[in-house]
Amino acid sequence: MAKVSKRVAANKAKIERTKFYPIDEALGLVKGCASAKFDESIDVAVQLGIDAKKSDQVVRGSVVLPAGTGKSVRVAVFAQGDKAEAAKAAGADIVGMEDLAEQVKAGNLNFDVVIASPDTMRIVGTLGQILGPRGLMPNPKVGTVTPDVAQAVKNAKAGQVQFRVDKAGIIHATIGRRSFEDAALKSNLAALLDALVKAKPATSKGVYLRKVAVSSTMGVGVRVDQATLAA
């Protein structure tokens, strides 16, 4: 373990906190600093040129990462009739109505994503205090309240990530795992940044994508030279 610690410490020492690195070098540094025995997530933080205190500048949405997230996702769906059958066929792990709501109320939250057909919101709406704080409440802005529950299930299973700007104007998201090839991580990052640009508020002025930094679950952040992202 001492050797690993020395290696990681040496890699961390290479990182200049104020320097902007080419994306390939940044990913190399991040992977080099990943010290955990598990396959750490590779995360990104994007500083946006918005005023997060203004309601018309809240950036929120979702995007399907082309290379996936490397994570197995369990999906629960509130639907009935044909939509319930379509959700099951698309790979949903749990499908129900009142019975699913009772499971949620009982604390059985064995899922990562909740999707709801619009006609079920009378039931789902009563679960806000349970699902909301956990980031599981379905919302049309991120595609989890939709008539096409089957497609929403497919998106979730394929590697869809949701994003929402925090109070500091920063978006945090996972773009893959340490085991991913750099090309996969770069394609996922490009897809995320493209989605953020499309979600840019009309009232946002000046530079929109101000800073981009990548890190591993247990590692330090490495700033990215955005000019190298299009390469």
From Swiss-Prot:
Gene3D superfamilies: 3.30.190.20, 3.40.50.790. Pfam families: Ribosomal_L1. Transmembrane segments: none annotated. Keywords: Repressor, Ribonucleoprotein, Ribosomal protein, RNA-binding, rRNA-binding, Translation regulation, tRNA-binding. One of its GO terms (cellular component) is cytosolic large ribosomal subunit. GO terms for biological process: regulation of translation; translation. InterPro entries: Ribosom_uL1_bac-type (IPR005878), Ribosomal_uL1 (IPR002143), Ribosomal_uL1-like (IPR023674), Ribosomal_uL1/biogenesis (IPR028364), Ribosomal_uL1_3-a/b-sand (IPR016095), Ribosomal_uL1_CS (IPR023673). One of its GO terms (molecular function) is structural constituent of ribosome. Part of the 50S ribosomal subunit. Belongs to the universal ribosomal protein uL1 family. Binds directly to 23S rRNA. The L1 stalk is quite mobile in the ribosome, and is involved in E site tRNA release. NCBIfam families: rplA_bact. This is Large ribosomal subunit protein uL1.
